[in-house]
Amino acid sequence: MIGPPVNLPKWLEENSHLLKPPINNYCVYNGDFTVMIVGGPNARTDYHINTTPEWFYQHRGAMTLKIVDPTEGNNTFRDIVIREGDMFLLPANTPHNPVRFADTVGIVLEQKRPAGSLDRMRWYCQREGCGAVVKEAAFHCTDLGTQIKEAVEAFKADEEGRRCKQCGEVAEWCPKPGSIRDPNLE
């Protein structure tokens, strides 16, 4: 059965309590496409790698999409600010960390994963000048609402598994307060 349209402001008024850390997402549609409403703030340091493109629309406030850009050679870390009213299409297989700030809301649309495809959650060393891969988890994504959260929670619980094999730094499981510039304060 085809359901009715979702009035986003009304949905947020009635359901914003469903947007819970560490991901703060809620899947409103989950079929051939997954449509998530995502609120802020969130607390994660992972970079998600999806074999399909992801579409972002920022309904309220601005967010920062931290990416590892393979097109600039040597996997350059960079930030893309998506402001209120902006939409952005992230190419498939681009490592990305969506950073959401207080009182912000966005919509993310993802395709259903092809059979046999693996999503990856990757954590990089945060020490200046290092950037080595600290840990990577792979899974066939069938439920975005729970699987990403499970991977983040497992990383949080494994302090020794967060140690960089290249420099010895222990990676943070969530960003340190004030470590990421909030474009909403500019």
Swiss-Prot record:
Cited Gene3D superfamilies: Jelly Rolls
Binding site for O2: 44
Catalysis: reaction(s): 3-hydroxyanthranilate + O2 = (2Z,4Z)-2-amino-3-carboxymuconate 6-semialdehyde
Pathway(s) this gene product operates in, as recorded in its UniProt entry: Cofactor biosynthesis; NAD(+) biosynthesis; quinolinate from L-kynurenine: step 3/3
E.C. code: 1.13.11.6
Binding site for substrate: 54, 100, 110
This protein's record includes keyword Oxidoreductase: yes
NCBIfam families (UniProt xref): anthran_nbaC
Alphabetical list of PANTHER family matching this protein: 3-HYDROXYANTHRANILATE 3,4-DIOXYGENASE
Family assignment from sequence similarity: Belongs to the 3-HAO family.
Protein name as it appears in the record: 3-hydroxyanthranilate 3,4-dioxygenase
Species, as recorded: Chaetomium globosum (strain ATCC 6205 / CBS 148.51 / DSM 1962 / NBRC 6347 / NRRL 1970) (Soil fungus)
